[in-house]
Amino acid sequence: MKNDQRRLRDRVAVFACIAIAAIAIDQLTKMWALSALADGRTIRVIPGLLSLTLVRNPGASLGMGSGMTWLISLLAMAACVALVVLAVRTISMKWTVLFAFAFAGAFGNLIDRVIYAEGFLNGKVVDFLNYGWSIGNVADIFLMLAGVAAVLLLFLGEPFSQKDLDEANGKTLGDDANATDDGAKAA
């Protein structure tokens, strides 16, 4: 039991450190964009691929949901709570890291929706990374990385819970008792 508590403590510490650092990076880059790009200028980083342009986005990714900012904010709050719960419940450090980045992305954009709100949770997200087909921010990158990592972890069969680990190892609840019976039958 002590080992489980230590692992939980370690996962919580990793989650907190990654989430705090990632949120800080997101917010610092947004502060920079608000000051450096406020005059409407565009900085070309990689011509044709990436430029820096300040946009205030009332919606979600790819401009969807611009009329439902309050709903997007409530969903982001629910997602943040769910990600913390998942991080505490998993036995996998890989899943913990994924949840920390997803939390940082959701919370980073939620901060904007609260800070820059003129009404109930209707603030606009600070976007400045212009890819030509979409404009986003560092929080969006964290969310995208978490999504890709989730697909990879699922594809690779990374166990989320002790039950998943036991199933991956071919164990079920009755396996310990059946192992002696099977061994006796085989002899």
From Swiss-Prot:
Keywords: Aspartyl protease, Cell membrane, Hydrolase, Membrane, Protease, Transmembrane, Transmembrane helix. This is Lipoprotein signal peptidase. Residues 167-187 are annotated as: Disordered. InterPro entries: Peptidase_A8 (IPR001872). The active site is at residues 127, 140. Its EC number is 3.4.23.36. HAMAP family: LspA (MF_00161). The gene is lspA. The lineage of its organism: Bacteria, Bacillati, Actinomycetota, Actinomycetes, Bifidobacteriales. The keyword Transmembrane helix applies. It is a multi-pass membrane protein. Belongs to the peptidase A8 family. It catalyses: Release of signal peptides from bacterial membrane prolipoproteins. Hydrolyzes -Xaa-Yaa-Zaa-|-(S,diacylglyceryl)Cys-, in which Xaa is hydrophobic (preferably Leu), and Yaa (Ala or Ser) and Zaa (Gly or Ala) have small, neutral side chains. Pathway: Protein modification; lipoprotein biosynthesis (signal peptide cleavage). One of its GO terms (cellular component) is plasma membrane. It is found in: Cell membrane. The keyword tRNA processing does not apply. One of its GO terms (biological process) is proteolysis. GO terms for molecular function: aspartic-type endopeptidase activity. This protein specifically catalyzes the removal of signal peptides from prolipoproteins. The chain crosses the membrane at residues 12-32, 68-88, 91-111, 141-161.
